[in-house]
A protein has these predicted regions:
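Short acidic/polar hinge/loop motifs at secondary-structure boundaries
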Residues: 7-36
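Outer-membrane beta-barrel channels and translocator barrels
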Residues: 26, 130, 141-142, 178-180
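A beta-strand signature from Gram-negative outer-membrane beta-barrel systems
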Residues: 26-69, 130-132, 151-156
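Transmembrane beta-barrel domains of outer membrane proteins
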Residues: 35, 56-58, 136-140, 149, ...
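Transmembrane beta-barrel architecture of outer-membrane proteins
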Residues: 50, 130-134, 164-170
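Surface-exposed loop/interface segments of Gram-negative outer-membrane beta-barrel transport/assembly proteins
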Residues: 62-117, 158-159, 168, 172-247
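Outer-membrane beta-barrel transmembrane domain signature of Gram-negative proteins
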Residues: 110-138, 142-143
Length: 247
């Protein structure tokens, strides 16, 4: 269970996101406290059976001068390990050993004509870039501290077509009234997330797909991607799908 500025948030209640924390800009976090065991259950009930993470966001402070801060970072990610698979020549050699009496055409799955050498893992994986930008404005006007923050994060995945974008807005204002007898704290945090999770089935397909086949086929009716087809033009149902097409 996460509690952000006193508001309990269950991870399970946010569909399509990596978790509750993915909606919050790291630059907005002031403190991070973990409660566990009986203390968490006593306060938050059964929802806290696995512990509670208390998060408070930053706020303006009385006496602080106006301050504008920008923070940015850029990241590069690269895949480091791939499955060792057969290249085209090795694949053809093994096909001749395993199926010496079957030559392309009689079975589409054994067709090794128009030989190319496609490394399917290299086709679906690649270097990716990420960048984060954070703008914070804070200060105080007499007895009213304030703070406004804007954040933007963009992350491409090492699996092609994977992408995550997040826009965040945070604000807080805490006026003190009636000769310091009344203090009001108003704060809010909002986020807009736009993500695309690529089909993970393409990863397994890339380790199994025929390396003698090309990624693209100009005559293919399926988006121009090469595919196993029957004589009538329908896909071969038992064949592994083109990994790139799955993305």
């Amino acid at each position: 269970l996460y509690v952000i500025d006193g508001v309990p948030i269950d991870d399970e209640s946010i569909s399509g996101l990596g978790g509750a924390l993915s909606t919050l800009s790291p630059g907005d976090i002031e403190t991070f406290t973990v409660l566990k065991d009986a203390s968490a259950t006593a306060i938050y009930g059964s929802r806290a059976s696995n512990g509670v993470i208390l998060i408070t966001t930053k706020k303006g402070k009385i006496g602080n001068p106006f301050k504008l801060t920008y923070t940015g970072n850029f990241s590069l990610y690269t895949p480091t390990r791939k499955v060792d698979v057969l290249d085209a020549d090795q694949y053809v050699t093994q096909q001749k050993i395993w199926n010496p009496n079957q030559v392309g055409g009689s079975d589409a799955l054994l067709d090794t004509t128009n030989l190319v050498n496609t490394n399917w893992q290299e086709e679906i994986f690649g270097n990716s870039f990420g960048h984060d930008h954070y703008l914070n404005l804070s200060g105080a006007s007499k007895n009213t501290p304030y703070r406004v923050s804007l954040g933007f994060s963009n992350q491409d995945g090492i699996l092609q077509t994977d992408n995550y974008q997040r826009y965040t807005l945070g604000f807080s204002v805490g006026p003190t009234l009636l000769n310091d007898h009344l203090k009001i704290d108003l704060n809010g945090n909002g986020s807009y997330v736009n993500n695309r999770f690529a089909n993970r089935g393409a990863i397994g397909a890339a380790t199994q797909f025929d390396p003698t086949k090309p990624v693209k086929d100009p005559e293919s009716p399926y988006g121009g991607y090469w595919a196993w087809l029957q004589a009538n033009g329908d896909p071969v149902g038992r064949a592994t799908g083109n990994p790139v097409a799955q993305l």
